[in-house]
Amino acid sequence: RRDFDAYADDMLFICENGALVMQRDQRVLIDPIDPSFISGIVTATKSLEGVYPVVCRAGVALIEKTASDEFIRNTRMYYPSVEVVADLTAPGRLPDVCKVAFYDEGDAQTHELPALRAKLEGPLSITLSGEHWVDVMKPGVNKGCAMRGIQQKLGISAAECMAFGDYLNDCELLQAVGESYAMENA
């Protein structure tokens, strides 16, 4: 939203890899993770050095106090509202968690992605969302599903929609619209 401030009130934003759609700071769609999974997700990479979880809720990203400066810098690039907490799984933090993202100071595809898939795939959806990022969501949640939800809610067809993508987590989004463009840096 902050990158589109002049036009933001006229736009819908697909957030948290499709688990949340916002318009004018209001939730249009939300598809949260079952709270019973959150603790297991957050602790899935505890044994991996340089990997940090971000618990994503509508409007705020939660990170732990033990985070590195590099991780905090990178998190603030993508999440305008970051709250540093002692325990990501403390009571009261689990409702409406849209996504748990993991930042890897190394290469996410070869380091954390295999570990997360081995521990979590099946009951959860896991996708590579950047060189250093892996996202964990409710099964079947992706940007394409969010786009189809928007289309249904607004009564518009895929042919009337356009999308731009820059990474692998945009594939379903690009397939859900009539006009799609992969960015040059993709």
Per-range role (PLM):
Residues 2-3, 173-175:
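Catalytic cores of alpha/beta
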Residues 19-20, 134, 181:
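Glycine-centered loop/turn positions within well-structured domains
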Residues 1-71:
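Active-site phosphate-binding/coordination module
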Residues 40, 44, 48-164, 168-173:
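Conserved acidic, metal-coordinating active-site core of Asp-based
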Residues 13, 180-182:
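Short, well-ordered beta-strand core segments
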Residues 169-170, 183-186:
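Short, glycine/polar-rich helix-capping loops at beta-to-alpha or helix-loop-helix junctions
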Residues 10, 97-98, 177:
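Short, well-ordered alpha-helix to beta-strand connector turns
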Residues 5-6, 116-119, 178:
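Short, solvent-exposed amphipathic alpha-helical segments in soluble enzyme
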